[in-house]
Swiss-Prot record:
Species of origin: Homo sapiens
Record topological domains on the Cytoplasmic side: 1-36, 94-119, 189-193, 284-297, 360-390, 438-466, 762-914
This protein's name: Solute carrier family 12 member 9
Top-rank taxon, per record: Eukaryota
Compartments (UniProt record): Cell membrane; Lysosome membrane
Gene coding for it: SLC12A9
Length: 914
């Protein structure tokens, strides 16, 4: 965790002039020794070559011939608009911080997290691997179109034998050449790319000059077989030179049959071919680990490359429409050779473009693979790809990728691979747009890119357009890619990954939570929508684990805050001892699988700390309304960490960098007879403080005896039938008659009903006990209670029990604390009443027999026992001197009752209105 002494920047401000100092953690290809490429050689050249590919020479006639000039320009504008949206996102992310090796993968993973970044990074890697194979297969086909021997044998220039084995051999030889260049490092790759760029530029220049310099001519088209295999007379296309009639004829669309496939073209199919050729905008970003200044080079170089290729495509569209008739455009996609002043130069351009695309894909794939291996997302599978040379060249990743490309070449399915490659590229582009969109929506202060020509609108459009293009190009491949991404993300989530990168999801959640918390107006609260919002005060969680889980069940969709008071005075301490404890408590919440917030405080006493937490815990309209405490008794604390399966062994203890076991982060339970942090006086005072602050109070006793299946997160399926007993009457001072249920009694009913909504308690039966005096007739009070339960939609079994004279039922209502502030006679009566009430409750639980005076004959020892008992918690006496006596009465009342919740409610929580 960063401290006051941590540097604000990850590099030294003072250093040797003109020397770039790497950020912490940069190594390998991201280190200073490997950063050699300029903007032009590292970004512009590979991006231009990738965006041209073979389309610029072999598909211009296809697009213009079928779509016409106007629709072709519209397609080009739409395609580049989609790409430009992603380019804007790339520029924004690249100028917001130091970009290391891995290009698009690095940007996505450091924004969306390792799960999404790793899954898309692997898919982008596979796309580059397949893209390299597609380029090589296309190059082999182009070579064999000119130099391949036909069925009659070699003749003239057609001397190369053909067939699957020969094609695989040619592809493997070309792959060896490409792999050798990439293995020797980025420097040789940059020089080879620059040489290729010169060849392609020279070839394009010769084509552009030929459009102007060559006069009109007829060009013989490839003959087509006629019906029944008969030969047709030769057909010719016409190069007219600059002619307005030719332009007019080529303005509109004229979709026809593709002579290479026999399929009739339409707007979508032509647009897909054009868009396939325009992808490749990440070629420069993939070299981020070798760039001298990636934050400047990536945006500048990518924008220049996109603008340059767009201009060349537009120029070629216009020149083709002005000079070539539709027959030539539709029947001879390689017509550039026929009109060129020197046709071999066009062939050189075609071969150089395909070769450069394969080199760009292979070296880009190796850099992505090395970044994935360095981040250790896929474990030992990619471990060999971490190896680099002394100069930082990831040669092992190149060889790794070379082997995969060789496997793809064995398949030889060019057309199938092309669609999958494009879809995988689009998934990566959409993820980059989503990353930028997330950063923009999160409104984090540290997201301030120097490139400002973007907004959330452009990012959102980029995501939507990339997804649309995926399904337009290949619906099957698009659906499969999204499914694969989901499976990989699930795998990485299950495996776990580094958490030090930061998650934009956390920033987005903060932004949304803050917005909705501001809308949560406490002045609009209504009892219809009341829900429990609990503050559980815990001294040592090792002894309170069952209560921790029980409180999690009682909250039922409400707020749950886990509070702890550390004793001390900040004036006498060198630092705050509370802050280092948060990690341990958050790990406790994760391991216990409870949905709780953690709030810790430092205070000279537990009582004052509880007051602090009651006042300041929560935020806005989400503040605790109920205090939950463990019961204060002399029972020795149990160490539940030793018996609970979730805590007996540290999770992920075998993973490098995993946190230590929780048993080492919390002290052992208090030994019997040792001093306690809280005395009985302060304990009762804390209860009184909560009631004064208008908070409900729940005291939990013997929660460790709860059946384990009732504390589980499952459905609570068990062969043992349990009861949940509710006594909605103050057993220490019955008042108001047998049918009286006050606000506190209704709160008991509500909490018991909420517990029954939890799956683990579905099978437990709710029983409500109605106490009658020895002279009261049964039936009438039960009917009134059943009517009340019906109005409150509470399903429960009502049982009437007869209590003896000591209950005092039906006495006039008086001050609640009267029994505790009167003479000694009141204490004696209260003690007797507590013993009588305890015997009565025990008799109904099936835990024993013998009620108080005039009590029942005994409980049903053969029937189901009570898993949990809800009792009415009397208000503490007004005189603090009587707090210990009050606590002693509560101890007598709940002695040997098993798991018990003493509940006192101060606010209405039930409503019969719609």
């Amino acid at each position: 965790m960063a401290s006051e002494s941590s540097p604000l920047l990850a590099y030294r401000l003072l250093g040797e002039e003109g020397v770039a100092l790497p950020a912490n953690g940069a190594g390998g290809p991201g280190g200073a020794s490997a950063r050699k490429l300029s903007t032009f050689l590292g970004v512009v050249v590979p991006t231009v070559l990738s965006m041209f590919s073979i389309v610029v020479f072999l598909r211009i006639g296809f697009v213009v011939g079928h779509a016409g000039l106007l629709q072709a320009l519209a397609m080009l504008l739409v395609a580049y608009f989609i790409l430009a949206l992603t380019v804007l996102s790339v520029c924004a992310i690249a100028t917001n911080g130091a970009v290391q090796g891995g290009g698009a993968y690095f940007m996505i993973s450091r924004t969306l997290g390792p799960e999404v970044g790793g899954s898309i990074g692997l898919m982008f890697y596979l796309a580059n691997v397949c893209g390299c194979a597609v380029s090589l297969l296309g190059l082999v086909e182009s070579v064999l179109d000119v130099f391949g021997a036909d069925a009659t044998g070699p003749s003239g220039l057609r001397v190369l034998p053909q067939g699957y084995g020969w094609n695989l051999l040619y592809g493997s030889l070309l792959l060896g050449l490409v792999g050798g260049v990439c293995t020797l490092g980025a420097g040789l790759y940059a020089r080879a790319s620059f040489l290729t760029f010169l060849l392609v530029s020279g070839s394009l220049a010769s084509v552009l000059i030929s459009f102007v310099a060559v006069g009109p001519r007829d060009i013989r088209l490839t003959p087509r077989p006629g019906p029944n295999g008969s030969s047709l007379p030769p057909r010719f296309g016409h190069f007219t030179g600059f002619n307005s009639s030719t332009l007019k004829d080529n303005l509109g669309a004229g979709y026809a049959e593709d002579y290479t496939t026999g399929a009739v073209m339409n707007f979508a199919s032509v647009f897909a071919v054009l868009f396939n050729g325009c992808t490749g905008i990440m070629a420069g970003a993939n070299m981020s680990g070798e760039l001298k200044d990636p934050s400047r080079a990536i945006p500048l170089g990518t924008i220049v490359a996109v603008a340059y290729t767009f201009f060349v495509y537009v120029l070629l569209f216009f020149l083709s429409s002005f000079t070539c008739d539709r027959t030539l455009l539709q029947e001879d996609y390689g017509f550039f050779r026929a009109i060129s002043l020197w046709p071999p130069l066009v062939l050189i351009g075609i071969y150089a473009t395909a070769l450069s695309a394969s080199m760009s894909s292979l070296i880009g794939a190796s850099r992505i693979l090395h970044a994935l291996a360095r981040d250790d997302l896929f474990g030992v599978i990619l471990a060999p790809a971490k190896v680099v040379s002394r100069g930082g060249n990831p040669w092992a990743a190149v060889l790794y990728s070379w082997g995969l490309v060789q496997l793809v070449l064995l398949a030889g399915k060019l057309n199938t691979l092309a669609a999958v490659v494009t879809v995988f590229y689009l998934v990566a582009y959409a993820a980059v747009d989503l990353s930028c969109l997330s950063l923009e929506w999160a409104s984090a202060p540290n997201f301030r890119p120097t490139f400002s020509l973007f907004s959330w609108h452009t990012c959102l459009l980029g995501v939507a357009s990339c997804l649309l293009m995926m399904f337009l190009i290949s619906p099957g491949a698009a659906g499969g890619s999204l499914l694969l991404m989901g499976l990989l993300a699930a795998l990485l989530t299950a495996r776990g990954g580094p958490s030090s990168w930061g998650y934009v999801s956390q920033a987005l959640l903060f932004h949304q939570v803050r917005k909705y918390l501001l809308r949560l107006d406490v002045r609009k609260d209504h009892v219809k929508f009341w829900r429990p919002q609990l503050l559980l005060l815990v001294g040592n969680p090792r002894g309170a684990l069952p209560l921790l889980r029980l409180a999690n069940q009682l909250k039922k969709g409400g707020l749950y805050v886990l509070g702890h008071v550390t004793l001390g005075d900040l004036d006498s301490l060198p630092s705050d001892p509370v802050q280092p404890q948060y990690g341990a408590w958050l790990s406790l919440v994760d391991r216990a699988q409870v949905k709780a917030f953690v709030d810790l405080t430092l205070s000279p006493s537990v009582r004052q700390g509880a007051q602090h937490l009651l006042r300041i815990s929560g935020l806005g309209g989400m503040k605790p309304n109920t205090l939950v405490l463990g019961f204060y008794d002399d029972a020795p604390p149990q160490d539940h960490f030793l018996t609970d399966p979730a805590f007996s062994e540290p999770a992920d203890s075998t993973r490098e960098g995993s946190s230590p076991a929780l048993s080492t982060l919390f002290p052992p339970p208090r030994a019997p007879g040792s001093p306690r942090a809280l005395n009985p006086q302060d304990y009762v005072a804390t209860v009184a403080d909560a009631l004064k602050m208008n908070k409900n109070v729940v005291l939990a006793r013997a929660s460790g005896a709860l059946p384990p299946e009732r504390l589980s997160r499952g459905s609570g399926g068990t062969s043992q039938l349990h009861h949940v007993d509710v006594w909605p009457l103050n057993l220490l001072r019955p008042r108001g008659g047998p049918g009286y249920v006050d606000v506190c009694g209704l709160f008991l009913l509500q909490m018991a009903t909420i517990l029954g909504m939890v799956p683990a308690w579905h099978s437990a039966r709710l029983r409500i006990f109605l106490c009658l005096g020895p002279r009261e007739a049964p039936g009438a009070a039960e009917g009134r209670l059943r009517a009340l339960l019906s109005q409150l939609r509470i399903r429960a079994e009502v049982q009437e029990v007869v209590w003896g004279e000591g209950a005092g039922a039906g006495e006039p209502e008086a001050e609640e604390e009267g029994d505790f502030v009167n003479s000694g006679r009141g204490d004696a009566e209260a003690e007797a009443l507590a013993r009588s009430a305890n015997a009565l409750v025990r008799a109904q639980q099936g835990r024993g027999t013998g009620g108080g005076p005039g009590g029942p004959e005994g409980g049903d020892a053969e029937g189901p026992i009570t898993a949990l008992t809800f009792l009415y918690l009397p208000r503490p006496p007004a005189d603090p001197a009587r707090y210990p006596r009050y606590l002693a009465l509560l101890e007598t009342l709940t002695r040997d009752l098993g798991p018990t919740l003493l509940v006192h409610g101060v606010t209405p929580v039930t409503c019969t209105d719609l």
